[in-house]
Amino acid sequence: MILALAMLIAGILLLIKGADWLVEGSSSLAKRFGVSDLMIGLTVVAFGTSMPELLVNIVSSVEGANDIAIGNIVGSNIANILLVLGIASIIRNVAVKTSTVWNEIPLALLAVLVLQLMANDSIIDHYPVSELSRSDGLAFLAFFLIFLWYVAKMRRREDEIENGFVERGVPVSIGFVSIGLGLLLLGGKLTVDGAIDIASLLGISQAFIGLTIVAIGTSLPELVTSVLAAVRKKADIAVGNVVGSNIFNVFWIMGVGTIIHPVRLDPALNADLFVAILATVVLFIAVHTGHVHRRIFLFWRQRQEHVIGRTDGVIMLLLYVAYLGYLVWRG
C-alpha cells in the first residue's frame, strides 16, 4: 500500500513538473522563432497545461482502466468548478467577463452534455455496452476546433499583452521539452499504476480513485493558478482558466484519448456525469445572481455585474464535500 501510494503521489508530481517544463521549453522555442505571446498562450501553454490529464487518460485507456480514464476527466471538471472556484471565490469575490458568462460557460455545459449523450449507447441506441468510439473522438475534436477558432477570434479583439515568456537557448529549450515529455510519460504511468494498485488493495472501485485522488491531483495546476489569481486581484483569470480547462478536458483530451483507444463506460458513472452537468449549471446561476440559493429557492434575481461571491464559494465547497461523501457511500 505504501509503495502504491508513493507511486501515485510521485506520478502526480512528475505530471505537474513535466507539464511545467514542457510549457517552458516549448514557449522558449516559439519565442525564439518569432511566435507572438498571443499565439503561445493560445497553443503551447493551453495544450501543455492539459498534458497531465491527457497522459493519464491515454495510459489508463491502453491499460484497460476505463473507469480511471473517464473518472479523471469527469472528476477533474467537477473539482475545477466546485473545489477550485469555490476556494478562489472565498478568498475574493470573483468577477467574470461577459464573454465567459454567455459563451464559454454554456460551451462547457455543452461539452459535458455531449459527453453524457455519446457515452450512453446502451440507453440511447440499446447497444449491449456503452462506449466512446473513435468516431466519437473525431466528433469531440471537431467541437474542439470550433472552440479554438472562437478563442482565437476573441483574443484578437483584445490588446496583446506581454506575458513574460522567457527566451532561452535552443539546446536548453529542447532539453526542457525532452525532459518534460519524459516526466509526463513516466508520471502518467506511475499515476495510473498506483491508482489501480490502491483500488485493488483497498477493495474500492477504480472509478472512485479516478474521480477523487487522480482528478484532484491533475487539477492542482488549475487550483494554484486560480488561488494566486484571486490573491493578486485578477480573479477573472481564475474563471477563464477553469472553464477553458473543462472544455479542453472533454473535447481535446477525450477526443485524442478515444481515437487512440475506445473507452467503455460503467453505467454507474452516469451519476458523476450528472454532477458535472449540475456543477456547470450552478456556476452559470452563480454568475448571474451572485447567490446560488436565491435563484434555486426563491426567484431569478439578475445582477448587473457578473460576480461569484463568497457565499457562492461556500455553497460550492459544501456541494463538493457532499459529492465526496456520496462517492464514499457508493464505494
Residue ranges and their predicted role:
Residues 1-331:
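Hydrophobic alpha-helical segments, chiefly the membrane-spanning helices
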